[in-house]
Amino acid sequence: MTKQVEIFTDGSCLGNPGPGGYGAILRYRGHEKTFNEGYHLTTNNRMELMAAIVALEALKEDCDVVISTDSQYVRQGITQWIHNWKKRGWKTADKKPVKNVDLWKRLDAALSHHTIKWEWVKGHAGHPENERCDELARAAAMNPIQEDVGYQPGS
């Protein structure tokens, strides 16, 4: 039987662009693993994407996954926009390069082995796991140690 996994994510950026961090919780059968890391210069959208990517990349086998995010950018991007971006060679409808394409490609690859259900939760509305992820992300953003090599000013 396929493992049933829950993932909760959040990203934070102090300035946007500025120092940023992500936080994620991976839950399986009552056990939890948390992830967070801070970056010197990045954006909130990149950190929202990184939270989902890092948690998914931690899975060692195919799983049924429910991912909860407060990011409409991530949820809509992966459930609605990515199919056309790929068809257009990673261009938007107005033929501009997709922002954060490095992370969208990485997220797409990380999803490929799993059955995914995306759930949107309202941020800062008392959702316990979202609040914990927000705390993890903000703590990481306040102590950045990584360089976001994929960040491009203006994205």
Curated annotation (Swiss-Prot):
EC number(s) on file: 3.1.26.4
Task: Name its cellular compartments.
Answer: Cytoplasm
The record's section on Pfam families has: RNase_H (PF00075)
List the SUPFAM superfamilies hit by this protein, alphabetically.
Answer: Ribonuclease H-like
- Per its database record, what is this protein's job? Endonuclease that specifically degrades the RNA of RNA-DNA hybrids.
Per the record, the similarity remark reads: Belongs to the RNase H family.
Could you tell me what this protein is called? Ribonuclease H
Q: Which organism is it from?
A: Enterobacter sp. (strain 638)
Chain's gene name: rnhA
